[in-house]
């Protein structure tokens, strides 16, 4: 019997693509970089995903991901790279300006609130995730939030989940399920932790 659900946030409960589009367009306007077309945004998303996957394998640090993805993207689009850090700092803030639920994610969390413990487990940045959780109301619905930047280690590392267990207590492996969209972060992380996994299928 499931007693604990570990929810990924971006791409699982909240629609990251919509927040990403808003934040990128906002920053392009603020930094006078013209228009970010759909084709450009798609190319950025591919670059961004690659950097996050390298973080998950331990190949890159978080700072290398934050700055490297935009440096590579700007170079590929012929844009100046001198404001990469300022752009990323603003981008992180703007990611938290708006929160869009995936499918009926909010309704599902509400329905499950009285029957299971629910926690957020996310590799997103603190500044972006705390604002999105507050704006969406998830901070009031969930029993707790674990942000890898604060934990000090990222999903899918087993040490991340060990930190979760230290906070919430011990459960049998078949009493905990992680629900997420990422095979490399959420599903692999769940397998590393020895718990049940669900690739977003319940959302």
Residue ranges and their predicted role:
Residues 202-203:
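Conserved small/polar residues in nucleotide/adenosyl-binding loops
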Residues 192-193:
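Structural motif
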Residues 84-88, 94-100, 105-136, 144-148, ...:
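Substrate-recognition element of Asp-dependent hydrolases with the DxDx(T/V) motif
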Residues 83, 140-144, 172-176:
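Short acidic capping loops at alpha-helix termini that bridge into adjacent secondary structure
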Residues 117-118, 175, 196:
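Residues at the starts of beta-strands that form the adenosine-phosphate
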Residues 2-103:
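N-terminal helical cap/lid subdomain that shapes the substrate entry/recognition surface
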Residues 154-187:
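Conserved Lys-Pro-Asp/Glu-containing loop-to-beta segment of HAD-superfamily phosphomonoesterases
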């Amino acid at each position: 019997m499931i007693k604990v659900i570990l929810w990924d946030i971006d791409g699982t409960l909240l629609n990251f693509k919509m927040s990403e589009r808003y934040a990128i367009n906002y920053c392009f306007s603020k930094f006078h970089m013209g228009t970010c077309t759909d084709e450009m945004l798609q190319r950025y998303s591919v670059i961004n995903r690659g950097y996050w996957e390298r973080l998950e394998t331990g190949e890159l640090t978080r700072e290398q991901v934050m700055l490297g993805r935009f440096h590579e993207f700007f170079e590929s689009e012929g844009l100046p790279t001198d404001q990469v850090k300022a752009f990323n700092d603003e981008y992180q803030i703007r990611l938290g300006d708006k929160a869009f639920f995936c499918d009926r994610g909010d309704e599902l969390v509400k329905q499950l609130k009285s029957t299971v413990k629910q926690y957020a487990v996310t590799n997103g940045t603190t500044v972006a995730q705390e604002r999105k959780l507050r704006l969406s109301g998830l901070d009031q619905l969930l029993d707790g939030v674990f942000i890898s930047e604060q934990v000090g280690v990222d999903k899918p590392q087993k040490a991340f989940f060990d930190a979760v267990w230290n906070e919430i207590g011990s459960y049998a492996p078949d009493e905990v399920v992680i629900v997420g969209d990422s095979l490399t972060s959420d599903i692999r992380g769940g397998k590393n932790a020895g718990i049940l996994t669900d690739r977003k299928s319940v959302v």
